[in-house]
From Swiss-Prot:
Catalytic activity: 2-C-methyl-D-erythritol 4-phosphate + NADP(+) = 1-deoxy-D-xylulose 5-phosphate + NADPH + H(+)
Binding site for Mn(2+): D153, E155, E229
Gene assigned in the entry: dxr
Binding of NADPH, residues: T13, G14, S15, I16, N127, E129, G213
Metal-binding among keywords: yes
Species whose genome carries this gene: Pseudomonas aeruginosa (strain ATCC 15692 / DSM 22644 / CIP 104116 / JCM 14847 / LMG 12228 / 1C / PRS 101 / PAO1)
Identification of the protein by name: 1-deoxy-D-xylulose 5-phosphate reductoisomerase
Matches recorded under InterPro entries: DXP_reductoisomerase, DXP_reductoisomerase_C, DXP_reductoisomerase_N, DXPR_C, DXPR_C_sf, NAD(P)-bd_dom_sf
Pfam family, one: DXPR_C
Amino acid sequence: MSRPQRISVLGATGSIGLSTLDVVQRHPDRYEAFALTGFSRLAELEALCLRHRPVYAVVPEQAAAIALQGSLAAAGIRTRVLFGEQALCEVASAPEVDMVMAAIVGAAGLPSTLAAVEAGKRVLLANKEALVMSGALFMQAVKRSGAVLLPIDSEHNAIFQSLPRNYADGLERVGVRRILLTASGGPFRETPLEQLASVTPEQACAHPNWSMGRKISVDSASMMNKGLELIEACWLFDAQPSQVEVVIHPQSVIHSMVDYVDGSVIAQLGNPDMRTPISYAMAWPERIDSGVSPLDMFAVGRLDFQRPDEQRFPCLRLASQAAETGGSAPAMLNAANEVAVAAFLERHIRFSDIAVIIEDVLNREAVTAVESLDQVLAADRRARSVAGQWLTRHAG
């Protein structure tokens, strides 16, 4: 019998990381943790190291590494604790690693995700921002290295499952008319427009269907999450923005669909649980038990669909425009959104200001070509600076 596959989980203490480790624990004969990384929840990271006994753990700073190393050593755990961004890249690209779960939220996850790609790993991509920011640069690295890139977002995973194996030959060539990207509409789908300016971070984070981290919950509430996913879908499946249509589906049972020229629409359905796409990507092309309960169609009862309202969700419009513009526009969109969401979560701005900040950044900053990681990160820094200037002028 072959040895278990070794996985580095980047962002192990987040919701995606924890779901990944749940699947690992269900299949100890197939998978083992090689490296676990965490940013701020270091007590949780310690508990995960005690349970999974990885070869490495990675934390942001040296002081935290020394403290965690001491705690683990006292418990008889031989995990070696590293720190810093270079260590993240090292555990993502180590020769011993078979697959990498890229689940660090936001731009911070780009260097380590790209390191895994350049090392030719099986990359389970949960960090959509990495692909949104670097686009062609990222996909060229995938082709050059021979990495296997498998999407973890439930929507892109559903699209991947609904497309023919030869979709890389071109969507039109394999008979695809369009991709239907589903969205729940979030917690404010029916909130009166005049009330959106006064909603709280707690309300924005109360997603009706999914259990997610705070940043992605706010992105779902604004539908920026869907805008980022539209950009991601274009890169993953070599689609034009006009070939991707966003459909609001409040039940989150259909995770996305593919519309074919013969009139067929193929969809992937399931309970809203991230262990389904995670286990699919880990085992692909096989399927394994994920721990997710079977879908009860009788309990679902009905499936509803709506067009998104751009007045209610201006972030979706801004993301679509950035997708059409290309170049550094998606990286700047993402950076401005990260700054704005952080300010909203800290109660410095209103929910409705998120789109205002993003639009201000996109209007002020010139779009440039991005042909290197340095250029991507430079665009990210410029956008964050302009967003910060807006906060200085307007935030309470």
